[in-house]
């Protein structure tokens, strides 16, 4: 039986206009991916304490669809919080490689973004972007939980935009 849309009653047509949405599969994929982020916690210093605070009742990352995972195979976001030493760099890269695609990285704090106060030390990596590609940088020493939530929101916007347009965003 073929459905003739011209014979729909006006009140039913208005109901359809309010309750039916037309979109593309790419937009839906972007929406789903951005609202179900599962970060791998890679806390190395004081920034990790602030990251743990975002999981508490006051900030509650669950309302954004963010659920912390302990395994890289279950994660799609890596939050690097703290000082990365040259001895820790291969482990960081291995964890990143174990994450399934698509995957994103957030560098949280001055140490993860540029080396922080230990930038002149021979054993400190001068930014985690020398090891893995970083999508969002969150400055601060340490950044507060609200800054991490802002960074996660920016990552969500980036994921939706890239899914919608097919273009890569590199400056966040």
From Swiss-Prot:
GO terms for cellular component: plasma membrane; respiratory chain complex I. Keywords: 4Fe-4S, Cell membrane, Iron, Iron-sulfur, Membrane, Metal-binding, NAD, Quinone, Translocase, Transport. NCBIfam families: nuoB_fam (TIGR01957), PRK06411.1 (NF005012). It catalyses: a quinone + NADH + 5 H(+)(in) = a quinol + NAD(+) + 4 H(+)(out). It comes from Brevibacillus brevis (strain 47 / JCM 6285 / NBRC 100599). Its EC number is 7.1.1.-. Signal peptide: none annotated. The keyword Transmembrane does not apply. It is a peripheral membrane protein. Its cofactor is [4Fe-4S] cluster. This is NADH-quinone oxidoreductase subunit B. GO terms for molecular function: 4 iron, 4 sulfur cluster binding; iron ion binding; NADH dehydrogenase (ubiquinone) activity; NADH:ubiquinone reductase (non-electrogenic) activity; quinone binding. Pfam families: Oxidored_q6. Gene3D superfamilies: 3.40.50.12280. It is found in: Cell membrane.
């Amino acid at each position: 039986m073929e459905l003739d849309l011209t014979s729909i009653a006006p009140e039913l047509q208005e109901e359809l206009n309010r309750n039916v949405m037309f979109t593309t599969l790419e937009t839906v994929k972007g929406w789903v991916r951005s609202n179900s982020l599962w970060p791998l916690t890679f806390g190395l210093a004081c920034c990790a304490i602030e990251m743990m605070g975002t999981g508490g009742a006051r900030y509650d990352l669950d309302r954004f669809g963010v659920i912390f995972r302990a395994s890289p195979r279950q994660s799609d976001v890596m939050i690097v919080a703290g000082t990365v030493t040259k001895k820790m760099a291969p482990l960081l890269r291995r964890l990143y490689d174990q994450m399934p695609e698509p995957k994103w990285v957030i560098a949280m704090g001055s140490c993860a973004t540029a080396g922080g106060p230990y930038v002149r030390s021979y054993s400190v990596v001068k930014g985690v972007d020398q090891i893995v590609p970083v999508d969002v940088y969150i400055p601060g020493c340490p950044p507060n939980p609200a800054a991490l939530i802002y960074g996660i929101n920016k990552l969500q916007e980036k994921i939706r935009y890239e899914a919608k347009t097919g273009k890569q965003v590199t400056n966040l």
